[in-house]
Amino acid sequence: MAKLYFYYSAMNAGKSTTLLQSSYNYQERGMNTLVYTAAIDDRYGIGKVCSRIGISQEAKLFYTDTNFLEQVEQVLKAKKLHCIMIDEAQFLTKKQVHQLTDVVDELKIPVLCYGLRTDFQKELFEGSQYLLAWADELQELKTICECGKKAHFVIRLNENGETVTTGEQIQIGGNDKYISVCRYHYKKKRGELRQITK
């Protein structure tokens, strides 16, 4: 039975690596996958899903006006599809997440989405919000903070490596601009912990 899956985490948890491994597993069995990545994310080149461990795969770009249901139906005219995979799914719109539920429910094709849960302000991205609400299956991919605890949050850094607390929700960057941290270190690095004297 086809389902909509959302694999979410902070940065550097291996979301793209997991997507690429899943795509490889399908292809190894002679099955066709259709892989998308956000057009806005050009860190590793245009039209590629790239992992920090050095593997990559060509991908179709999605924009805020991409209609996934229409595009998948077009591809189905030429070949059978066994799975749709979306990297950087936090950049999806509410409408696009709904279209992906239609791909699952009407076309009976599983859709695997991989993305961040929250931004550097601990706020949900639009795509993540609706994937968390509408996905059939949710799975957190784990990464660790500098202290060894599970990292849930992302800190944005400026060019001097200092914590940034304001700004636009979306600013594309990698390890030079973002680090994943636990809640305690999120608060500490943002100066949000109270000074308690004993």
From Swiss-Prot:
<feature type="binding site">
    <location>
        <position position="182"/>
    </location>
    <ligand>
        <name>Zn(2+)</name>
    </ligand>
</feature>
<dbReference type="GO" id="GO:0005829">
    <property type="term" value="C:cytosol"/>
</dbReference>
<protein>
    <recommendedName>
        <fullName>Thymidine kinase</fullName>
        <ecNumber>2.7.1.21</ecNumber>
    </recommendedName>
</protein>
<dbReference type="GO" id="GO:0046104">
    <property type="term" value="P:thymidine metabolic process"/>
</dbReference>
<dbReference type="GO" id="GO:0071897">
    <property type="term" value="P:DNA biosynthetic process"/>
</dbReference>
<keyword id="KW-0479">Metal-binding</keyword>
<feature type="binding site">
    <location>
        <position position="145"/>
    </location>
    <ligand>
        <name>Zn(2+)</name>
    </ligand>
</feature>
<dbReference type="GO" id="GO:0008270">
    <property type="term" value="F:zinc ion binding"/>
</dbReference>
<keyword id="KW-0547">Nucleotide-binding</keyword>
<dbReference type="Pfam" id="PF00265">
    <property type="entry name" value="TK"/>
</dbReference>
<feature type="active site" description="Proton acceptor">
    <location>
        <position position="88"/>
    </location>
</feature>
<dbReference type="InterPro" id="IPR027417">
    <property type="entry name" value="P-loop_NTPase"/>
</dbReference>
<keyword id="KW-0963">Cytoplasm</keyword>
<keyword id="KW-0067">ATP-binding</keyword>
<comment type="subunit">
    <text>Homotetramer.</text>
</comment>
<keyword id="KW-0808">Transferase</keyword>
<dbReference type="GO" id="GO:0004797">
    <property type="term" value="F:thymidine kinase activity"/>
</dbReference>
<dbReference type="InterPro" id="IPR020633">
    <property type="entry name" value="Thymidine_kinase_CS"/>
</dbReference>
<keyword id="KW-0862">Zinc</keyword>
<feature type="binding site">
    <location>
        <begin position="9"/>
        <end position="16"/>
    </location>
    <ligand>
        <name>ATP</name>
    </ligand>
</feature>
<comment type="similarity">
    <text>Belongs to the thymidine kinase family.</text>
</comment>
<dbReference type="GO" id="GO:0005524">
    <property type="term" value="F:ATP binding"/>
</dbReference>
<feature type="binding site">
    <location>
        <begin position="87"/>
        <end position="90"/>
    </location>
    <ligand>
        <name>ATP</name>
    </ligand>
</feature>
<feature type="binding site">
    <location>
        <position position="147"/>
    </location>
    <ligand>
        <name>Zn(2+)</name>
    </ligand>
</feature>
<keyword id="KW-0237">DNA synthesis</keyword>
<feature type="binding site">
    <location>
        <position position="185"/>
    </location>
    <ligand>
        <name>Zn(2+)</name>
    </ligand>
</feature>
<dbReference type="InterPro" id="IPR001267">
    <property type="entry name" value="Thymidine_kinase"/>
</dbReference>
<keyword id="KW-0418">Kinase</keyword>
